Every structure is written in structure tokens, then in C-alpha cells.
Amino acid sequence: LGSPFGGFDTLGSNR
């Protein structure tokens, strides 16, 4: 969760 969404830098975000 994160990369495809771009808002969750808890698991694996793009940020």
C-alpha cells in the first residue's frame, strides 16, 4: 500500500 496510491509512507509509499 502506498506506491499505487501515493499517500501511505508507512508500508511502501512512493514518498
From Swiss-Prot:
Nacreous layer of shell. This is Uncharacterized protein IMPP15. It comes from Nautilus macromphalus (Bellybutton nautilus). The lineage of its organism: Eukaryota, Metazoa, Spiralia, Lophotrochozoa, Mollusca.
